[in-house]
Amino acid sequence: MQNEEMKKLIELNNYVKKEIDKRLEKFFNEKIKSAKKIDLIYEKLLVDMKKFIQRGGKRLRPTLMLLGYKAAGGTDFTKALDASLSLEIFHNFVLIHDDVMDGDLTRYGGANITGIYNKRFSKQLDEATARHTAESIAILAGELNEFFTFEVLTKLDIKKEIIFDMMAHFQRVLFETGAGQQLDVMSSIRGNLNLAKIEKVNYYKTAQYTVTSPLQLGVIAAGGNEKLMKTFNEFGSELGKAFQIADDLLGMFGSTRQTGKPVGSDIREGKQTLLMYYAKKLCKPLEWKAIETRLGNEKITSEDVRLVRNILKESGAQAKAAVAAEDHLQNALKVVDGMSIDEETKSILRAFSVYCVIRKK
């Protein structure tokens, strides 16, 4: 049964990805033409933005939006797909700015916007100036995508009241995601592993943003359903926690090929995760000291990363985090089972829930 549910999820996601990619192609081609009339440098930026958004991304958020739309009784899936384009562009805006805040130069297995421009500017500028200028361009690219998000919504062929409700939803999500992002950034410099703060970051930066918001946007697009909005919030809260813990484990123990980011990036950035919280609780003092001295150190080597990984495994922190992810997954599945929606959507939501925890990239 689970294999059949996963097959349906994969088929739906492949379909959504194809449809969203077509819409991205059309949207950015129009923007590139408009930018060319202003300046060739501006045109180049839009070309780079188009290549970046097309290079990676699983299009999970638009897929979830369609599921939320269907669950709420929506039937015009072409219009729902048109609306879900806003989610993918919004997500790209958040990713670009997230990479700037984290100091990352790669995403999707290659250079991100900062990385692309850092390489170009390094040929003519000193290292610090090249990096600053590249990050400035990346911030601009992110802001353009934020603007494009709302532009997509204003051009939808649906009731204006629904468009306004969708805009209000995005504004709330942006405000709350900003809170999660700030808490995440601040936790890296405070160095205090606070469970309540870790869970708050996971809720606002992942659960609400990745799971709850896309589902609720689908409900809004279908005309709204307050009970379903609350149910999706409960579901997203549990699954988002499972997703983030699984993501932390993948980031720590996965390869660059799997994650598209450098191995050990979470260690270098000093990320305060549930995995690290368990490590502090379970490690012997000298073991934790070995981890602590490497957290937030950008100059750690691959050998340092291997050492931290081994300590996390042998201390039981890795296993405890995996159990926590599984517990939240089971809670999410219970919420799905109690939903008053069509069985096909329930089965795909079950498959998506499992995928969030077992995924390898």
Predicted features by range, described:
Residues M1-K361:
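All-alpha prenyltransferase/terpene-synthase fold signal
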